[in-house]
Amino acid sequence: MFENQPKGLYALALANTGERFGYYTMIAIFVLFLQSNFGWSEGLAGTVYSTFLMLIYFLPVLGGWVADKIGFSKCVTFGIVVMFLGYLLMAIPAGQGTFAITMMMVALLMISIGTSLFKGNLQVMVGKLYDAPEYADRRDSGF
């Protein structure tokens, strides 16, 4: 699969796999968690879920702008760290009160910001691996 591909492709694919694993693991049970842990209605849990997804898909526009200013690899690295800290914060049991809700909201914001810096910029880095003439004919297979 990675035969005759640029050396960095494996590391970038592994980073993307880790990010998607964290995202889909959390998102699969998120609404159920909101309902059972906080006693929220389906509507309120759905609103929080939808707002989180909106941030996940809207904020990468800003992540691209930041990458133009500081560079793609710095954005990807910083995004991974911020996402990891957000998932870690989300995993800390904090009970059911206001503090727990605040902690969860901060964690969701961190995950959204981390994803915005990571997701789109990682794809750019994969594309740049194929700028070298010896890999240009394999560009489509890298994606």
Residue ranges, per PLM feature:
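Short amphipathic helix-loop junctions that connect adjacent transmembrane helices
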Residues: 26-44, 48
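Loop-to-transmembrane helix entry
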Residues: 40-54, 137-143
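C-terminal ends and interior cores of transmembrane alpha-helices
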Residues: 77-99, 104
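Central cavity-lining transmembrane alpha-helices of secondary-active solute carriers
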Residues: 50-68, 119, 123
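Intracellular juxtamembrane helix-capping segments at the cytosolic ends
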Residues: 117-133
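Hydrophobic core of transmembrane alpha-helices in multi-pass small-molecule transporters
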Residues: 17, 86, 99-121
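Cytosolic juxtamembrane N-terminal segment immediately preceding the first transmembrane helix
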Residues: 1-23, 98-100
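Cytoplasmic membrane-interface "Motif A"-like loop-to-helix N-cap segments
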Residues: 68-83, 133-138
